[in-house]
Each structure stands twice: as C-alpha cells, then as structure tokens.
C-alpha cells in the first residue's frame, strides 16, 4: 500500500481501493499533480468544509463515481450536488469494503463558502483509518486536544499532523500531539502552502525525534510504503 503526500493536507492512499483525503488539487500552489493525473478514486474523505480541504471533492466524486465520507452536514451539502456520500459523526466508526474509518475530534471551523454565503459545515474532524492491516491517522485541521492521548491505544502506524500554526497547531504543539499519540511515524502537513502558515519543518523533525517519535518529511509527491 502506497501513501502519497500531495501538499497542504492532501493524502492519497493507493491499495486495493484508492482513497484521497482533503482533495485540494486545483488552486493548491504546492500540489505536484493535476486532477487528470490522479488515479481512479474510490473514496474521498473530507475532514471539514473549508475550501482548502473540501477542494475538488465534487469533481473527483462525479468523475470516478466515488463516495465521499464526511460529517452529516457536508454530506447533505454534497448530496444536493449529485454526489454519492456516506455521512458519519465524531466518535462514530464504520467498516467499509477497504477497512474501518473512525471520525476523531478536531478543534477548528468547518464553514463552506458558497458564493457570497457561508454555509454551516458541521463539526471538523480527523480520521483514523484501519486499512490492509495498518492504521493511518489524519488529524485534519486542529489545535492540540487532550483527546489525542486516546490515540496512543490505537498503535497508529503513521500520523499526519498539521504544524503550520495560525489556523492549526504550531511546531511546539504538534510535537506535544505526536508525543501523546505515539505513532510509529509522524508526517508533518499543512505548512508552507502560503506564507501565513510557514513552519520550520526541520525544527519539528528535530524536536519530535528528541521525544522518540520518528519523523518522515514528505515533499509533495513523495510516498511512504506501508
């Protein structure tokens, strides 16, 4: 199974089924691929309604007849646009044909910008994905939360954590999160897309590895094999 970081918070999981998380492809200044360069997508996971995460979900879903997995409010919004969805809420889990997805808490917003209007997008979340014998945690956009301590019991193989500050955890808080979660590997995300969320990723790697957590810095387009 191949897990590819496509910049910002976009993660592509290629295995028996292909899954993309927070598919912000068009307009993403650090994404190395275009929509037509994606493989066939079976499922789309959306952590919250902001445009840099909801991204191209509608176009990808319609092109691939893919199912979007997200909270109830986002699924309702997408369903009105003709997209196939599976609604969940935080704390809920469901066994799909590729594995199990559990929605985890995130501290952030989730408004959907639709023209000049902001539509309520439910509660933001992360995802704990159990797939092909591995566990992948994608935190979504979030500040540091005590709930992350519970993830230490999950024996997470790889955790994708935001480190860019301002809207999400900064380097220091992301290190604290990694220490609480205790993943086998941590991959930093949601940094450097724009100047406002610049972060010193090498400093994050140094600090988190001093705490005993292996850090893998993936440049956009680079992959991990799990």
Swiss-Prot record:
It holds the Pfam family Lactamase_B_2. It comes from the Bacteria. GO terms for molecular function: hydrolase activity. Keywords: Hydrolase. The keyword DNA-binding does not apply. NCBIfam families: PRK00685.1. Belongs to the UPF0173 family. This is UPF0173 metal-dependent hydrolase TM_1162. It comes from Thermotoga maritima (strain ATCC 43589 / DSM 3109 / JCM 10099 / NBRC 100826 / MSB8).
